[in-house]
């Protein structure tokens, strides 16, 4: 299945953005201008399956898929780098990380709505589950806007592979269900 996503940063996200990525608040007008410039370039989609067809996943209810922001983020970042505008490229990458987190959240709600189940844990491929699953997931989902390279990488770069554990009973808020806190390098979660 394919679903278009529409992740956006709200006015309340900007202070957290500056704190998380160590930007002074005075930089916000420049950061927000870059954000407005990249929005039309974003083509965010989730490609996913509600089928229980991954033998490596032992849960009785789960979904799996890719979430991507599209090529526009990579292209804008590369454009800035080609013009030696390193800070602007970094800002694009930081905004992309925040938008990708929003896209995960939106994807989780789509899965909950379609499955009639509730998210209990969100896992990134490579954390709980082996990256060896990537070719199998890619083949089963056949995402038309994502490439799987010979080097076992996904393009666009702002693409993640997720496995969502589901249950019949409601649990914590989706923002509290990421399972990588022990190894996480983020200073604060979005």
Walk through the language-model features, giving the residues of each.
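Conserved mixed alpha/beta catalytic, RNA-binding, or beta-rich assembly cores of soluble enzyme
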Residues: 59-127
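General structural feature for long, well-ordered alpha-helical segments within catalytic domains
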Residues: 30, 34-38, 103, 107, ...
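Generic local-structure boundary detector
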Residues: 49, 53, 74-80, 102-106, ...
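Weak global preference for isoleucine
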Residues: 31-34, 86, 91, 95, ...
């Amino acid at each position: 299945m394919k679903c278009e996503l529409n992740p956006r940063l709200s006015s309340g996200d900007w202070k957290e953005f500056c704190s998380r990525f160590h930007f002074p608040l005075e930089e916000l007008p420049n950061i927000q201008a870059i954000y407005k410039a990249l929005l039309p370039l974003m083509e965010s989609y989730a490609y996913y399956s509600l089928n229980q067809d991954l033998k490596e996943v032992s849960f009785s209810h789960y979904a799996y898929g890719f979430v991507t922001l599209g090529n526009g983020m990579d292209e804008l970042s590369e454009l800035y780098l080609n013009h030696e505008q390193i800070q602007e490229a970094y800002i694009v990458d930081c905004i992309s990380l925040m938008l990708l987190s929003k896209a995960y959240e939106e994807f989780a709600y789509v899965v909950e709505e379609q499955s009639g189940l509730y998210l209990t844990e969100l896992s990134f491929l490579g954390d709980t589950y082996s990256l060896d699953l990537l070719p199998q997931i890619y083949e089963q989902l056949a995402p038309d806007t994502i490439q799987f390279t010979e080097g076992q990488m996904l393009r666009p770069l702002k693409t993640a592979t997720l496995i969502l554990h589901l249950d019949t009973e409601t649990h914590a808020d989706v923002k509290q269900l990421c399972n990588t806190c022990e190894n996480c390098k983020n200073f604060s979660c979005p």
